[in-house]
A protein has these predicted regions:
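Conserved N-terminal segment of class I S-adenosyl-L-methionine
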Residues: 1-105, 109, 240-243, 251-255
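Short glycine-centered segments of the SAM/dcSAM-binding site in methyltransferase folds
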Residues: 48, 136-138
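Active-site micro-motifs of SAM-dependent methyltransferase domains
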Residues: 100, 117, 148
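Active-site acidic short loop of glycosyltransferases
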Residues: 104-107, 121, 135
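A short beta-strand submotif of the Rossmann-like class I SAM-dependent methyltransferase core
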Residues: 112-115
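S-adenosyl-L-methionine-dependent methyltransferase catalytic module, highlighting the catalytic core
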Residues: 120-128, 138-252
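Basic phosphate/pyrophosphate-binding loop/patch that engages nucleotide-derived ligands
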Residues: 131
């Protein structure tokens, strides 16, 4: 097992090195970009914030919450996840399925990071998001795309098998990954359509063309990279592996 682990780690490092020959836009990790660049400008003092699906690992930490005097509500389908969150991070918790939750329209900001791919009814989730936001409120969403090859494989393989494979190849995913995924309507085009349907305006977007799922074997990684380059040339942003969106609920005077 030690030898296999060494080979996997070597292939991962070699795959990362090969990536350096690609233009920068193909090397920016979407989740890291969401954390470091996309979401922070929206964090201003005094907001009522909802973290949807963050559970035990909310987007905000206690220092940021305290410094900005934020009120944080955690919404998750699993009460156990909410209970494992850092003590005092949530001012309130709601155990509910975001696909069928009716909000109070009191949120200035909603953060939903790598959650909607696990929701069976994303149309319902968009309705819930619109209901949680107050007029002028914003939703910040990061999601893997249904069009990604790993997403297609995820949909084909039995849950128990893909969970074992994922955890065997990438042990760090044992915490926080491995939940069932459906990728319902999780594409840039579908998200824009759903936003319009639920009276939300797309304010900002970013599209990302990298992931690490195939980096455990360099030849496979090279083939996947060639696929990404070709797919992007033909389909543009629909070829994104992951993407971020900021959605605004129009103010009452604009409705």
């Amino acid at each position: 097992m030690a030898l296999i682990r060494t080979l996997i780690d070597w292939n991962a490092m070699a795959s990362q090195a090969l990536d350096q020959i690609l233009p920068e836009k193909y090397r920016i990790d979407g989740n890291r970009y969401f954390i470091d660049n996309f979401a922070p400008p929206y964090l201003v003092p005094g907001l009522c914030v909802y973290d949807v699906g963050g559970g035990a690992r909310p987007f905000l930490n206690s220092d940021v919450k305290r410094a900005l005097d934020l009120t944080l509500t955690g919404v998750d389908i699993d009460q156990g996840e909410l209970d494992r969150a850092p003590t005092g991070i949530y001012d309130r918790t709601i155990c509910a399925d975001i696909g069928c939750f009716y909000g109070a329209g009191d949120a200035n900001l909603l953060i939903c990071q790598a959650v909607l791919e696990h929701v069976r009814d994303v149309d319902g989730a968009f309705a819930s998001i619109a209901g949680i936001l107050k007029p002028g409120g914003r939703a910040l969403i990061f999601v893997p795309s249904r069009n990604a090859l790993y997403a297609r494989l995820n949909l084909l393989l039995p849950q128990a098998l893909k969970k074992r494979l994922l955890h065997a190849v990438y042990p760090k995913t044992r915490e926080g990954q491995g939940f069932p995924s459906y990728y319902d309507q999780c594409t840039p085009r579908d998200f824009r359509r759903l936003a319009k349907k639920h009276n939300l305006v797309v304010e900002k977007e970013s599209f990302h063309y990298t992931s690490s799922y195939f980096s455990f074997f360099v030849p496979l990684y090279v083939l996947w990279r060639l696929w990404i380059l070709g797919f992007h040339a033909v389909a543009g942003e629909q070829a994104a592996e992951t993407f971020c969106m900021a959605l605004v609920k129009p103010s009452l005077d604009l409705c």
